[in-house]
Amino acid sequence: MARQTPISNYRNIGISAHIDAGKTTTTERILFYTGVSHKIGEVHDGAATMDWMEQEQERGITITSAATTCFWSGMGNQFAQHRINVIDTPGHVDFTIEVERSMRVLDGACMVYCAVGGVQPQSETVWRQANKYKVPRLAFVNKMDRTGANFFRAVEQVKTRLGGNPVPIVVPIGAEDTFAGVVDLIEMKAIIWDEASQGMKFEYADIPADLVDTSNEWRTKMVEAAAEASEELMDKYLEEGDLSKEEIIAGLRARTLASEIQVMLCGSAFKNKGVQRMLDAVIEFLPSPTEVKAIEGILDDKDETKASREASDEAPFSALAFKIMNDKFVGNLTFVRVYSGVLKQGDPVYNPVKSKRERIGRIVQMHANERQDLDEIRAGDIAACVGLKDVTTGDTLCDEKNIITLERMEFPEPVISLAVEPKTKADQEKMSIALGRLAKEDPSFRVRTDEESGQTIIAGMGELHLDIIVDRMKREFGVEANIGKPMVAYRETIKKSVEQEGKFVRQTGGKGKFGHVYVRLEPMDVEEAGKEYQFAEEVVGGTVPKEFFGAVDKGIQERMKNGVLAGYPVVGIKATLFDGSYHDVDSDELSFKMAGSYAFRDGFMKADPVLLEPIMKVEVETPEDYMGDIMGDLNRRRGMVQGMDDLPGGTKAIKAEVPLAEMFGYATQMRSMSQGRATYSMEFAKYAETPRNVAEGIIAKFQSGGKKGDDE
């Protein structure tokens, strides 16, 4: 089967935004105008097509990035048909991981901002992730029909808050309830959308007299931005004072692809105005798969040679599994982005991360949660495969004759955990299946069994994250569970270097045990130490035989899992084995593993050990009247206020760093202090030393409950 759409006419885009910027409504309109969805789904009714998990519809927030395909030939059918693959991404900070993983497979992004709220906290997080993956982007300022809407303020905030370089290509006609359409600065005409056809039809009109000066001013800025793309354009602009429509588009496109500028548009998705022009901008300014840097990976050879795969059907097949979902009808759905080559139904694929060969069952393309079967997918496509058993998020799939491992995704360590217990014996088995599946779908969610209590502990990125996991266990798998109180993921580390002997000797008649080591423990930078540990050896003259180095390393690492102070994992330590002794008969791996473990345990307590706690970046938006109460409350929670911003309408944004341990139940407290008018967002910032008075309480509690961290 030949390719239906040339790869140069593909656009793989993500739509990302802060919670209430109207992202799902914007995506809905995209599906409506591109002819996929005939009844517009409104989030207010809990009926949006993209929000396809029940909880998302109830909570009105988007949790999972559903991938959808649609086609667009321009508002006035001025382009050849383009295929746009849209990945809807969540706007809540607990789901930053979802944004991260969709950024990884996108070629371009459309940032949606609220014309009233402007650039909000989550927008900054998403912007940073887009920078990290060098994703070209444009911005759409939505909700121009709302009271307090101001397009130019949002443009200014992209500059000041995000460090972006925004270039508006439209200016709004009116605002709030007088918002009527936009002036297209490239065409220098007003675009008026027809309300009777829900914006499917439009007409060009003359620019309203009161907007002529504003339009000229912003057009000049836009043309200057385009001229900076090349010397030829700049020379022509300096000579003639203007550029042609084609030159403006080419200049802006080149600079957008180089991530030097961000084209900005505006509209009201709810009122069916502006999304159509934004779709045209996606085609005009965002890259096709062939215009982004070829994906890089590592070949399957001794030297782990770096290699890349061009976006071409002729290249060997390579794809990245970026999301796994459990579907009650077909089982596991693995969403893949194909970077090169062709994959047909029934083909074998190789997973170099797991060293496993699998066969593709069905290939389906998703439109929100409806699916269409495909015979094959090609370079640039995003689709879901059915029947893959051992694939997890971030794995590579490739042709087994041309093995390549694409760059892996990095997932953050969870910062909050809680115990879950099934209510009945019947729930026990269902719960372990449910948690296994959910952990496979979401790499930032972890499940483990506490060795002492035997309890099942689930860990994630925030309270909402774990709430939703528990909710999904109940809805999708019918598991009733009792939930414990949330627990903070503390860590332990040291502040000074020590040298420590560790000895393990057992004589019981016959063959004994003998392991003897000297280990140096040194602190590493705690700021960086999410999970850091280094092992080195400086043994001279064979005092410890080489074959036991690994055992010493293993003994130390196992001991680090349950720290010495309060049983929490140890981070930020460099351990160096530098001396010891051995016995020809009695020494073995186990003896040296135990000797390493003892040296670590005893040395740790002499090295000025401290407890680390997760510190969260908290941003509260509140009417000025409640600011004093909110600031006082943050201080009581050991918060450090970092700064304040004035927002429109007398609202203040307070930025602070607060220990996670003090943030439980914050939402309820904040609502009651502000009569429900304040909102907040929270994301992990760093680990920092826990104040002594707080740490003493945690350590005392641990010690009175029996020494979890001791192995003698």
Curated annotation (Swiss-Prot):
Subcellular location, in the record's words? Answer: Cytoplasm
Entry function: Catalyzes the GTP-dependent ribosomal translocation step during translation elongation. During this step, the ribosome changes from the pre-translocational (PRE) to the post-translocational (POST) state as the newly formed A-site-bound peptidyl-tRNA and P-site-bound deacylated tRNA move to the P and E sites, respectively. Catalyzes the coordinated movement of the two tRNA molecules, the mRNA and conformational changes in the ribosome.
Instruction: Give the principal location in a single coarse category.
Output: cytoplasm
Q: Name one GO biological process term.
A: ribosome disassembly
Q: Which keywords does UniProt give here? A: Cytoplasm, Elongation factor, GTP-binding, Nucleotide-binding, Protein biosynthesis
InterPro entries linked: EFG_II (IPR041095), EFG_III (IPR009022), EFG_III/V (IPR035647), EFG_IV (IPR047872), EFG_V (IPR035649), EFG_V-like (IPR000640), EFTu-like_2 (IPR004161), G_TR_CS (IPR031157)
Keyword Oxidoreductase assigned = no
What residues does GTP bind to? 17-24, 88-92, 142-145
Residue ranges annotated as coiled coil are none
Can you name this protein? Elongation factor G
Cytoplasm as a keyword of this entry, yes or no, is yes
One term under GO cellular component? cytoplasm
Query: CDD domains, alphabetically?
Result: EF-G, EFG_III, EFG_mtEFG1_IV, EFG_mtEFG_C, EFG_mtEFG_II
- One MF term in GO for this entry? GTPase activity
Q: Which family does it belong to?
A: Belongs to the TRAFAC class translation factor GTPase superfamily. Classic translation factor GTPase family. EF-G/EF-2 subfamily.
| Domain tr-type G per the UniProt entry, residue ranges | 8-290
Q: Which Pfam families match?
A: EFG_C, EFG_III, EFG_IV, GTP_EFTU, GTP_EFTU_D2
